[in-house]
């Protein structure tokens, strides 16, 4: 099963974890972005550049992802869509989305959008830290182990 990465917003340290995993596991990782990406040479890494525009990369991932694939994204609506197709969604902080958590996250996202639209400054998520990176690597390893069975 391939791995799809919403690469425009994916932190560099997470991409580096994915680059190493792709070669180690000989698993195809496709990074989808609306800008040029520089990736190390590997027959297991592929970039897919899409046109600039709102949700163009997300729509490409939804179109291509299949049941059992892994999608790396912090975009909650994208995660919800690929999960409807049977794909697994994992965010760069190592949280594997479930049906229950995705509903909760969509509700919170909509609430925060409403707050921002009314002029409230909500700030963004905290910076990615070493614990987040380790959690991501652990969840990725769990998924990779499941693929070996």
Curated annotation (Swiss-Prot):
Transmembrane segments: none annotated. Pfam families: DUF188. It comes from the Bacteria. PANTHER family: UPF0178 PROTEIN YAII. Belongs to the UPF0178 family. This is UPF0178 protein ETA_25650. It comes from Erwinia tasmaniensis (strain DSM 17950 / CFBP 7177 / CIP 109463 / NCPPB 4357 / Et1/99).
